[in-house]
């Protein structure tokens, strides 16, 4: 039997803290995903609203190409992809990295894409660990989103309190 809780224990919490800090300090955040991972991108965007954090989810390949030109240093692009096979993501990371954009990849497969990004989270693959064809890696993505959101909420609140203290001085 596959236990998602056991699988999630393999995720490095230091990486989550680093990614949360990177997102909280970003000028702009773009969250990318296609097909089912597009739903993960949208879910993360919706959940960010809960903590008052603004970001844009993009699930269309044409829009992903168009937004590359406007990204600069201080911006962060987070890509959700279960298999990291989409060649558009490789080209996108290559292009935006030249402008100093920070890239984060969240995936269930160890590929060259994670080596090209600044940060990555390698999630366990339920699909690969199970004999059932009905298990989908999106469940792991959604659980990860909640873990990252909890850490990000802490960072956003920490930044907000720091700004308030500076205003009082």
Question: What are these regions, as identified by a protein language model?
Answer:
Residues 25-143, 147-156:
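Glycine-rich phosphate-binding loops that contact phosphosugars or nucleotide phosphates
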Residues 1-15:
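HTH-adjacent hinge/linker in prokaryotic transcriptional regulators
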Residues 158-169:
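A short, charged, Gly/Pro-tolerant segment at domain boundaries
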Residues 2, 17-20, 146:
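Amphipathic alpha-helical segments that line or abut small-molecule/effector binding pockets
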Residues 12-15, 97, 160:
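Residue-level recognition of alpha-helical structural elements
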Residues 14-26:
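Glycine-rich phosphate/diphosphate-binding loops that line cofactor/substrate pockets in enzymes
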């Amino acid at each position: 039997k596959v236990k998602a809780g056991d699988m999630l224990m393999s995720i490095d919490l230091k990486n989550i803290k680093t990614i949360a800090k990177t997102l909280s300090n970003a000028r702009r955040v773009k969250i990318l995903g296609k097909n089912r991972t597009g739903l993960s991108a949208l879910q993360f965007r919706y959940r960010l609203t809960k903590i008052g954090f603004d970001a844009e989810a993009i699930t269309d390949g044409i829009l992903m190409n168009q937004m590359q030109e406007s990204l600069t240093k201080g911006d962060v692009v987070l890509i959700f992809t279960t298999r990291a096979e989409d060649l558009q993501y490789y080209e996108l990371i290559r292009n935006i990295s030249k402008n100093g954009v920070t890239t984060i990849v969240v995936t269930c497969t160890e590929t060259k894409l994670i080596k090209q990004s600044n940060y990555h989270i390698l999630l366990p693959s339920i699909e690969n660990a199970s004999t059932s064809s009905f298990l989908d890696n999106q469940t792991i993505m959604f659980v990860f989103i909640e873990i990252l959101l909890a850490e990000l909420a802490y960072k956003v609140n920490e930044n907000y309190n720091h700004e308030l203290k500076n205003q009082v001085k």
